[in-house]
Amino acid sequence: MIGRIAGILLEKNPPHLLVDCNGVGYEIDVPMSTFYNLPQTGERVVLLTQQIVREDAHLLYGFLTQQERTTFRELLKITGIGARMALAVLSGMSVQELAQAVTMQDAARLTRLPGIGKKTAERLLLELKGKLGADLGALAGAASPSDHATDILNALLALGYSEKEGLAAIKNVPAGTGVSEGIKLALKALSKA
């Protein structure tokens, strides 16, 4: 398997790249999140790769971060999700946004991606739950919106609301809202329901 490629970036045509490694040009498909962060053509690039071998092709998919490649691999494990759809998911949202959608069980957010219908979105949510690095450590940071969402949900559960009710209420809380204000807004949303 080819796990990493370092070389000179010769061509960039979304989502395809051509990378020269000691005279050999590798065609690599990348998600748009990686594409937008690439250096200019003619400069050195290092990509983590996932090689997929089919009977009619050997394909390389490239990523700038380990997090993206790991998420791509998790997506490939899901029934009905191929490499193209996994690439489309990572092109349509960042790994952090995907982890947040999984944590919040937000199927509507996933259905906005091209090629993702309601059933596929629900399958993604079900099969990715807890697999994105514990949903990226609830999005890796003590003050991240996802951590607040988790704290708000735990408070609602402690008050006797079901997880489904709590998740629905949290969708009404704007990102970046503090825990105490978030609980108030969620309770307000629940009282209207």
Swiss-Prot record:
Its main location: cytoplasm. It is found in: Cytoplasm. Pfam families: HHH_5 (PF14520), RuvA_C (PF07499), RuvA_N (PF01330). Transmembrane segments: none annotated. Disulfide bonds: none annotated. Residues 139-143 are annotated as: Flexible linker. Residues 144-193 are annotated as: Domain III. GO terms for molecular function: ATP binding; four-way junction DNA binding; four-way junction helicase activity. The keyword rRNA-binding does not apply. CDD domains: UBA_RuvA_C (cd14332). Keywords: Cytoplasm, DNA damage, DNA recombination, DNA repair, DNA-binding. Belongs to the RuvA family. Homotetramer. Forms an RuvA(8)-RuvB(12)-Holliday junction (HJ) complex. HJ DNA is sandwiched between 2 RuvA tetramers; dsDNA enters through RuvA and exits via RuvB. An RuvB hexamer assembles on each DNA strand where it exits the tetramer. Each RuvB hexamer is contacted by two RuvA subunits (via domain III) on 2 adjacent RuvB subunits; this complex drives branch migration. In the full resolvosome a probable DNA-RuvA(4)-RuvB(12)-RuvC(2) complex forms which resolves the HJ. This is Holliday junction branch migration complex subunit RuvA. The lineage of its organism: Bacteria, Pseudomonadati, Pseudomonadota, Betaproteobacteria, Burkholderiales.
